[in-house]
Regions:
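Repeat-mediated protein-protein interaction surfaces in helical alpha-solenoids
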Residues: 1-2, 93
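Function-determining sites in protein domains
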Residues: 166
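Terminal, low-structured helical/coil segments at or just beyond the last alpha-helical repeat
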Residues: 186-214
Length: 214
């Protein structure tokens, strides 16, 4: 019977695939082992069905989803990381590693989870990305996290972010500076271009003065 179910799992019809995956989940003695073996040779449609079925299934399939964090498909990696976080199995060192993912949406997902985990060991990696990540949304999210976790020692990176080519990143840098330093040189949201540049210049001038005092 298992052979027929496995055959159905590789059927071209997505519904047949899904029913076969659910049958394995229900009837196999060790479904995690069975699915792990299947995924080693599964094509993309079959693997997608397996991940879909396992994502909300009872039981622990963390080993399968941890392996999926190395998948070529960014959507699969993103969902695998989501599964691990939801199950409480995402470790800070995992998050630091996945901040190097090639897909910006995956990196943003990881940053959001690190925020909820409230683990400061990843702050250094987040600070670095705030100035170097190629995606402006990632840089913005990093600055937001720094504003919550960071200290005044992160201020130099925030000052550097004031020169970011993205306006939203620069705006987030101002908010982070206000939160970490207690200083306030104006609200960037709603400011005219001229007013915004004045706010940035005030922060840069303040930083120069701070540097002269140390």
């Amino acid at each position: 019977m298992l052979n027929q179910i496995l055959k159905d799992l590789f059927d071209s019809d997505p519904e047949i695939k899904k029913m076969a995956a659910k049958a394995i989940l229900k009837d196999a003695d060790e479904p995690a082992q069975v699915f792990s073996s299947i995924l080693k040779e599964a094509d993309r449609p079959t693997a997608t069905v397996v991940y879909d079925v396992l994502f909300d299934a009872e039981g622990d399939f963390s080993s399968i989803f941890r392996a999926a964090t190395g998948d070529d498909d960014a959507q699969v990696r993103n969902r695998a990381i989501r599964y691990l976080f939801r199950r409480g199995m995402l470790l800070p060192q995992d998050g630091i590693s996945w901040l190097e993912d090639s897909d910006p949406f995956v990196r943003r997902r990881v940053i959001s989870y690190l925020f909820w985990m409230n683990d400061r060991t990843s702050l250094g990696a987040v600070v670095r990305l705030s100035n170097t990540d190629p995606d402006p949304m990632v840089r913005k999210d990093c600055l937001r996290l720094i504003s919550i976790w960071g200290t005044k020692s992160e201020v130099p990176h925030l000052i550097k972010a004031l020169e970011d080519p993205s306006h939203m990143v620069r705006t987030q840098a101002v908010h982070a500076l206000k939160r970490l330093t207690g200083e306030d040189f104006g609200e960037p949201l709603g400011a005219s271009p001229e007013e915004f540049e004045w706010i940035v210049a005030k922060w840069q001038g303040w930083w120069e003065i701070m540097g002269e005092r140390t």
